[in-house]
Each structure stands twice: as structure tokens, then as C-alpha cells.
């Protein structure tokens, strides 16, 4: 058996359809897109300024078009199909929502995915989806999302969905306990990703929270399944994150991780995740 840790190589801030093949060609097996809302309606994949150093912050697409394009890349038999593209993270910019818009926004994202990505359950895209929310207070989003899939008779698609409550960032990131509580309120037990990190121009810091999260993931009663670190663009940072035990790297340069995974000392411990790797399964250190 292959006992190496499977690694998700997440291309950061992929918001225009033309960027999808470019990042996959660099070796990404997963993509992250930013979802911007108008009211409670997910309307664009768009980040805006400021963003990571060296990146064009204003590339965008209509959300429905973006999802249909993701579907093409992840549906076997499609001319654009890529076997290695196995997961995408939707970075949901729910900070713009009022409290009473949070649940409807979750319902709307579910409807969009159901129609434009999953093709109403009829041979849609096969990639796994992580819903990343910037505020642990927005757990109603997840409840609304799940409710729609149940109502529409597609509860089975929740097998393909994971969750990442990543903030708020200010005044400081929530504790792991507070994050765990939010998941309970969301009715989520399992399929949990945790992200930790900084913009690519921040000094790296001591990875203290990352190490704490990994310790929690690996503990007997840990609630986290996978941990990814962002934005990791240098060989040295990539190695440091792998050494600590992350499951994923979010990067502006997916080719960097591909290079590291070929190196002695890394190629025997880590490998690029494939579709057969379950993203909701904990791989302990």
C-alpha cells in the first residue's frame, strides 16, 4: 500500500474561465474561486483589490458560467475533461451580506451548483466541493444549502460537499473550540477542512496556529479532516508546511509543489492526491 500523505495542490484565486486550464497545466489538482454576492445572490467569481502580490485582482466571470465551465473540466467524456482535477474551493465572500441574507445565500449557492455544476444530478461534474465561509457566525448558510439539496431530492450530493469556516480574521482568528461549536450549529459532522495562512507578502510567522490545528486533527477526538495552508509560493515555505503535516497547499504557483514532490526526502512521504483519495478522511501524522 502507498502510505504517503496525499496532497491537494490548490490554485489560488482562479476566477476567470481562461485561467482554469492554465493552472491545471501547472499541476494543480484543485482550484479556489472567490464568489461575490449581489444581495443574497451569488453573481460573480471575483476577488477585487487588494490581492496577492504579482496577481491580477480583477479577473472575473458570471458565477453560473464559471460553474458550467468547471463542470466541463470534471465530467468524464467531455472534450475538456481533466482526470486530475478533483476538487474546488468556493471562497464565499459573505461579508457583504446582512444577517437575514445569510441563509438565502446558502440556498442560492445550492441551487446554482445543482443546476449548473451537478446538472440536476444527471451526469454532472464529479469534483468535490468545499464551501469556505469567512465567518463562523454564518452557519445558517450551510443549513440553507443542505436544506435545498434535501428538498430537491439530491441529498446524496452532500457526499461531495465539505466545509471550511475560516474566520473572522479580526481581531484574531476564532479558536478551534469556537469553530467546532459553529460546525455543530451548522449541523456539520465530518467533511471538515480548516485553512490557515496569510497573504503571500506577509512574513511567515511561526505557524503556531497551524501546528495547533494539526495537533487537533491528529488527536483521538479531532474534528478536522484536512488542513490547508495559504498562500504558499516559495519552495522553502512549501517544504515547511509539508514538514508540519498539512494536507493541502494553496498557491499562486502550483508548479512549485509539483517540483518539491519530486525531491528526495519528499517523494517518499507525500504525493499528489487523486480522485480516489477521500478528501473527508483524516490522514494522521
Curated annotation (Swiss-Prot):
Instruction: State the CDD domains in the record.
Output: GDPD_like_SMaseD_PLD (cd08576)
* Superkingdom: Eukaryota
The EC number of this protein is 4.6.1.-
Quote the cellular component terms of the Gene Ontology held in the record: extracellular region
Name the keywords, alphabetized: Cytolysis, Dermonecrotic toxin, Disulfide bond, Hemolysis, Lipid degradation, Lipid metabolism, Lyase, Magnesium, Metal-binding, Secreted, Toxin
Sites binding Mg(2+) sit at: 32, 34, 91
The UniProt catalytic activity note for this protein reads: an N-(acyl)-sphingosylphosphocholine = an N-(acyl)-sphingosyl-1,3-cyclic phosphate + choline; an N-(acyl)-sphingosylphosphoethanolamine = an N-(acyl)-sphingosyl-1,3-cyclic phosphate + ethanolamine; a 1-acyl-sn-glycero-3-phosphocholine = a 1-acyl-sn-glycero-2,3-cyclic phosphate + choline; a 1-acyl-sn-glycero-3-phosphoethanolamine = a 1-acyl-sn-glycero-2,3-cyclic phosphate + ethanolamine
What tissue specificity does the UniProt entry give?
Answer: Expressed by the venom gland.
Which InterPro entries does this chain map to? PLC-like_Pdiesterase_TIM-brl
Could you tell me what the cofactor note in this record states? Binds 1 Mg(2+) ion per subunit.
Tell me the function of this protein.
Dermonecrotic toxins cleave the phosphodiester linkage between the phosphate and headgroup of certain phospholipids (sphingolipid and lysolipid substrates), forming an alcohol (often choline) and a cyclic phosphate. This toxin acts on sphingomyelin (SM) with high activity (56.8 U/mg). It may also act on ceramide phosphoethanolamine (CPE), lysophosphatidylcholine (LPC) and lysophosphatidylethanolamine (LPE), but not on lysophosphatidylserine (LPS), and lysophosphatidylglycerol (LPG). It acts by transphosphatidylation, releasing exclusively cyclic phosphate products as second products.
Task: Describe the family membership recorded for this protein in Swiss-Prot or TrEMBL.
Answer: Belongs to the arthropod phospholipase D family. Class I subfamily.
**Which protein, by its recorded name, is this?**
Dermonecrotic toxin LlSicTox-alphaIII1ii
Amino acid at each position: 500500500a502507498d502510505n504517503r500523505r496525499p496532497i491537494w495542490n490548490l490554485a489560488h484565486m482562479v476566477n476567470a474561465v481562461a485561467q482554469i486550464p492554465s493552472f491545471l497545466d501547472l499541476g494543480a489538482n484543485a482550484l479556489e474561486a472567490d464568489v461575490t454576492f449581489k444581495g443574497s445572490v451569488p453573481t460573480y467569481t471575483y476577488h477585487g483589490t487588494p490581492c496577492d502580490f504579482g496577481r491580477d485582482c480583477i479577473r472575473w466571470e458570471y458565477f453560473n458560467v464559471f460553474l458550467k465551465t468547471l463542470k466541463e473540466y470534471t465530467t468524464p467524456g467531455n472534450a475538456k475533461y481533466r482526470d486530475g482535477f478533483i476538487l474546488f474551493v468556493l471562497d464565499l465572500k459573505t461579508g457583504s451580506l446582512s444577517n437575514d441574507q445569510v441563509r438565502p445565500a446558502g440556498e442560492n449557492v445550492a441551487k446554482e451548483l445543482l443546476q449548473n455544476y451537478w446538472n440536476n444530478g444527471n451526469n454532472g461534474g464529479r469534483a468535490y466541493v468545499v464551501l469556505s465561509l469567512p465567518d463562523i457566525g454564518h452557519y445558517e448558510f450551510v443549513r440553507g444549502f443542505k436544506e435545498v439539496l434535501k428538498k430537491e431530492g439530491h441529498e446524496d450530493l452532500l457526499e461531495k460537499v465539505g466545509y471550511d469556516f475560516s474566520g473572522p480574521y479580526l481581531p484574531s482568528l476564532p479558536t478551534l473550540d469556537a469553530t467546532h461549536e459553529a460546525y455543530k450549529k451548522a449541523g456539520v459532522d465530518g467533511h471538515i477542512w480548516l485553512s490557515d495562512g496569510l497573504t503571500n507578502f506577509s512574513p511567515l510567522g511561526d505557524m503556531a496556529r497551524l501546528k495547533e490545528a494539526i495537533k487537533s486533527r491528529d488527536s483521538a477526538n479531532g474534528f478536522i479532516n484536512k488542513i490547508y495552508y495559504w498562500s504558499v509560493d516559495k519552495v522553502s515555505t512549501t517544504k515547511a508546511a509539508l514538514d508540519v503535516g498539512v494536507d493541502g497547499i494553496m498557491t499562486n504557483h502550483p508548479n512549485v509543489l509539483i517540483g518539491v514532490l519530486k525531491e528526495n526526502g519528499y517523494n517518499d512521504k507525500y504525493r499528489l492526491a487523486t480522485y480516489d483519495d477521500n478528501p473527508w478522511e483524516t490522514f494522521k501524522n
